[in-house]
């Protein structure tokens, strides 16, 4: 009597169905640490092909958020892929440690306690180290393989000295200057801001149309009126429009476009000048229905005419500027060189300079109009309206909601404010034209990044690099007390400072005096107390790779890749590009990838106010880092990325699909020893040869998608391979021989050999993304020589590559197309409850001669392809009326009959009664032969 269960090779494995990632991942991290994985990956690899990804430094403040996780995971996927492709790809994580946010946190902690600057910097430094350690541990928990023992902080002495060394090169080129210019200014920061430190949000403002009365002069008389009429001149006003009424006291000119046409319009007894295209729009707003056009003229004709300020006792000129548009307002713009960059440029041509009547806190300081003194510019705009009404200079006003710049840290409105600052000149020596040409040669992903960078650089003013703060890298300049000029030996002095800072840090600058560095005429110079823009620091850090990796070709070092969020076009990408082009005349990167922002399920940005933040730490604790990594890879990260608990659950389903496939593969090779049981390729069944060739094909496509950084397509291919090629096809077709044939039969060992190879492929495919799961798989694989999956490369078996199956992919594609068509008919019969299982079927095929001969090749194995108990082939012409015609295959009809034969309790096939042994546990002759290894050998499957 045969024990049926014991006679079957039922699948079993130690590889768990439940991943328990949150626990298992920590074990794997300990293993990586124990074997010193990062060092092992890079030991003796410097002669390999090289790939350098430059880390955009996150800010050393607070817990990592989901955006940090996206960024670091993407970088990690790329670097793991590159290392598995044979590249030397080191990764040194960087951190930005200076800047306002840290200063403000320390100021809040200190409250009103006063300490000196030296102590303040020490406290900032201690805080930074704690933050970096916290973030570092969070990044390690994500599975990021990096040189965690050699991280790069902007506070490192080498970084401080390198930043000043780069600045010295720019000074040497004569591109640094000091000027009184309008820059972004935050009242709370009490400092200038970089463009990358502002964000635009909607703000309610008062928009006003103001009358600036023209002063009678000969230009008007000679140009426009033959008959001089003093009454008309006394009543002509030029209308200006502004959304910043607080700037009216600082107005020093009115700009019009020299090439556009303006009109003098009569309304009742008054005359107004405004641009031709906007006349109707302006008067409609003020509900004016009747007006008369007196004359038209080009803007250039009234240059230098003067107007009265609407309430200050001053006269202001009309000037020309091409930036004035006919799309908005009146075509006349009041010019405040203190509070607008375009205003400053236009006024500079007429030698009109800023007057600085708004202080650093936002209060007016006007000698000529004391009513506004000590009033904050944002709090008393209504006061300006009142004054204008009182002086009968307000033509019209309304409240509008418009996009306005805000401080990214304080979330409060900022202004342009003229202050003495240090700038890098970006206008000299065709700098922008040369940079445009280099931008074209860089690979931008997405491609729109190229035009975005070009547009931003085109309109970018000179770079303000000075900040009026404490916590930062110093601007080590000495300026003349009277002239404000840099010391003539500045470059030489800075080179000395660089050497000292490399050994002692920048404290040596802060704690020194003028005499330390200048011996002659030291009493006529003073130290600059400003610090450098943090974007200059991070922009200069690409040159540190040279020192960290001992790169031989130092002069021409270029990073292969920069990868950051899309906001970094105006931030780190731009600062790095400018610095590299100035100092080395080459871009710092060959490729730039940007990822989108993380949104919630409703498409809203993550924010504290909306309470929609999802912490990466909580996701890891609940689901594991591999789920988070899979979510990052699964989405097209070049767009904004959505996350929610529902989305993560869908990602978990996809993870289970991959894991269950791998578990099933393991369960079918539980008794397989590669060194004993492996079957040579040429002796394997043709179906097994097919799946190996198919797997190789998938690997080529997957590697290509990895190399194109299209990870969502990598994942889709892996899932497709697991679900379709394996789940719906190969693994279904081999079940019979896997379970029912003798455990040492060539048929079974052949499919086990194929499964063994598939696992070798699959574990490598998922490794860059599902790093912990891949390591878990690797630990259970036989014949592994390396301690970690990441110490291997893409699977290449010479025996498999050289050999080609007699029955190639095209051959099997044809048979699987037929199988797919037949399955449609079988599924219909299942739905109709005619059958429960396809093995109940006798399949009758009525087919054309060509197809008949093709299927005849399979002989008795045909039923195993269609997973039925019996298959019969007939000529197409003999098809009965009940046979159903295929819609996809020509001359192809199918008839399905339910078998009346007996079901074998072991293999579940239906066979004739006389094919069974007459005993209590009757099993079919096929099963007996399989057990005794006397069966006819399979060729195909």
Curated annotation (Swiss-Prot):
L-isoleucyl-5'-AMP binds at residue 564. Binds 1 zinc ion per subunit. Zn(2+) binds at residues 904, 907, 924, 927. The keyword Aminoacyl-tRNA synthetase applies. Pfam families: Anticodon_1, tRNA-synt_1, zf-FPG_IleRS. A motif ('KMSKS' region) lies at residues 605-609. GO terms for cellular component: cytosol. Keywords: Aminoacyl-tRNA synthetase, ATP-binding, Cytoplasm, Ligase, Metal-binding, Nucleotide-binding, Protein biosynthesis, Zinc. One of its GO terms (biological process) is isoleucyl-tRNA aminoacylation. Monomer. This is Isoleucine--tRNA ligase. It comes from Buchnera aphidicola subsp. Cinara cedri (strain Cc). The gene is ileS.
């Amino acid at each position: 009597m045969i024990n049926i269960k014991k006679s079957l090779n039922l699948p079993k494995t130690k590889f768990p169905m439940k991943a328990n990632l949150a626990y298992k991942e920590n074990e794997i991290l300990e293993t990586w640490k124990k074997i010193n994985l990062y060092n092992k990956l890079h030991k003796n690899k410097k002669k390999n092909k090289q790939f350098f990804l430059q880390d955009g430094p996150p800010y050393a403040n607070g817990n990592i958020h989901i955006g940090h996780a996206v960024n670091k995971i993407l970088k990690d996927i790329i670097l793991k892929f590159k290392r598995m492709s044979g590249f030397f790809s080191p990764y040194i994580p960087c951190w930005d440690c200076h800047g306002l946010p840290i200063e403000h946190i320390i100021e809040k902690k200190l409250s009103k306690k006063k300490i000196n600057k030296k102590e303040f910097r020490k406290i900032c430094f201690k805080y930074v180290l704690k933050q970096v350690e916290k973030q570092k541990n969070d990044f390690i928990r994500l599975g990021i393989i990096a040189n965690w023992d050699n991280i790069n902080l902007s506070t490192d002495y080498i970084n401080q000295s390198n930043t000043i060394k780069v600045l010295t090169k720019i000074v040497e080129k004569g591109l640094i200057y000091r000027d009184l210019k309008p820059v972004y200014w935050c009242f709370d920061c009490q400092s200038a801001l970089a463009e990358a430190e502002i964000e635009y949000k909607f703000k309610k403002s008062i928009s006003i149309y103001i009358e600036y009365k023209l002063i009678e002069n000969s230009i008007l008389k000679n140009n426009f009126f033959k008959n001089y009429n003093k009454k008309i001149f006394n009543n002509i006003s030029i209308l200006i429009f502004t959304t910043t009424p607080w700037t009216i006291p600082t107005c020093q000119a009115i700009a019009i476009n020299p090439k556009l046409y303006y009109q003098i319009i009569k309304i009742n007894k008054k005359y107004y000048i405004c641009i031709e295209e906007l006349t109707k729009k302006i008067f409609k707003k003020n509900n004016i229905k009747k007006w008369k056009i007196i004359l038209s003229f080009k803007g250039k004709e009234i240059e230098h005419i003067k107007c009265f300020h609407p309430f200050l006792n001053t006269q202001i000129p009309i000037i020309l500027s091409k930036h004035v548009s006919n799309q908005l307002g009146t075509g006349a713009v009041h010019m405040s060189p203190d509070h607008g960059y375009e205003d400053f440029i236009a006024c500079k041509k007429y030698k009109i300079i800023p007057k600085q009547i708004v202080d650093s806190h936002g209060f007016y300081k006007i000698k000529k109009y004391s009513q506004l003194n000590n009033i904050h510019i944002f709090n008393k705009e209504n006061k300006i309206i009142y004054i204008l009404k009182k002086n009968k200079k307000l033509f019209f006003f309304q409240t509008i909601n418009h996009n306005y710049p805000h401080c990214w840290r304080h979330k409060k409105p900022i202004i342009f404010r003229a202050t003495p600052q240090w700038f890098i000149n970006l206008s000299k020596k065709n700098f922008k034209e040369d940079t445009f040409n280099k931008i074209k040669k860089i690979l931008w992903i997405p491609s729109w990044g190229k035009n975005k960078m070009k547009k931003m650089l085109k309109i970018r003013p000179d770079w303000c690099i000075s900040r009026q703060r404490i916590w930062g890298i110093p601007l080590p300049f000495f300026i003349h007390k009277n002239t404000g000029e840099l010391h003539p030996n500045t470059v030489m002095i800075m080179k000395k400072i660089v050497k000292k800072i490399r050994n002692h840090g920048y404290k040596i600058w802060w704690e020194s005096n003028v005499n330390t560095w200048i011996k002659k005429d030291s009493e006529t110079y003073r130290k600059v107390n400003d610090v450098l823009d943090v974007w200059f620091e991070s922009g200069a850090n690409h040159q540190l790779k040279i020192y960290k990796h001992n790169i031989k070709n130092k002069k021409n070092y270029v990073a292969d890749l920069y990868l950051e969020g899309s906001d970094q076009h105006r931030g780190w990408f731009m600062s790095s590009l400018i610095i590299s082009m100035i100092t080395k005349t080459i871009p710092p990167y060959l490729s730039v990838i940007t990822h989108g922002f993380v949104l919630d399920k409703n498409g809203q940005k993550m924010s504290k106010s909306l309470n929609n933040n999802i912490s990466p730490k909580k996701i890891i604790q609940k689901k594991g880092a591999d789920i988070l990594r899979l979510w990052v890879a699964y989405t097209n990260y070049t767009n904004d990325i959505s996350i929610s608990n529902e989305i993560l659950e869908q990602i978990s389903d996809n993870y289970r699909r991959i894991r269950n496939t791998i578990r099933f593969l393991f369960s079918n090779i539980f008794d397989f020893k590669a060194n004993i049981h492996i079957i040579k390729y040429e002796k394997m069944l043709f179906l097994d040869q097919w799946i190996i060739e198919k797997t190789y094909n998938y690997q080529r496509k997957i590697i290509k998608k990895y190399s194109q950084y299209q990870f969502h397509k990598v994942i889709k291919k892996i899932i497709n391979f697991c679900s379709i090629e394996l789940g719906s096809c190969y693994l279904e077709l081999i079940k019979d021989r896997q379970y029912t044939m003798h455990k040492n039969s060539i048929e079974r060992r052949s499919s086990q050999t194929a499964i063994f190879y598939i696992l070798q492929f699959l574990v490598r495919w998922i490794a860059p993304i599902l790093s912990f799961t891949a390591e878990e798989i690797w630990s259970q694989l036989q014949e592994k020589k390396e301690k970690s999956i990441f110490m291997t490369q893409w699977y290449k078996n010479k025996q498999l590559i050289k050999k080609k199956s007699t029955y190639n992919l095209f051959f099997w594609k044809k048979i699987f197309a037929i199988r797919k068509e037949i399955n449609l008919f079988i599924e219909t019969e299942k739905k109709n409850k005619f059958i429960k299982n396809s093995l109940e079927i006798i399949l009758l095929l009525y087919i054309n001669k060509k197809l008949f001969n093709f299927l005849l090749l399979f002989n008795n194995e045909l039923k195993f392809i269609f997973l039925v108990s019996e298959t019969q082939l007939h000529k197409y012409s003999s098809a009965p009326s009940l046979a159903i015609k295929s819609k996809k295959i020509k001359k192809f009809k199918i008839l399905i009959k339910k078998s009346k034969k007996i079901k074998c309790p072991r293999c579940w096939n239906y066979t004739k009664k006389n094919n069974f042994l007459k005993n209590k546990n009757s099993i079919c002759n096929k099963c007996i032969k399989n057990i005794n290894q006397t069966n006819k050998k399979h060729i195909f499957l």
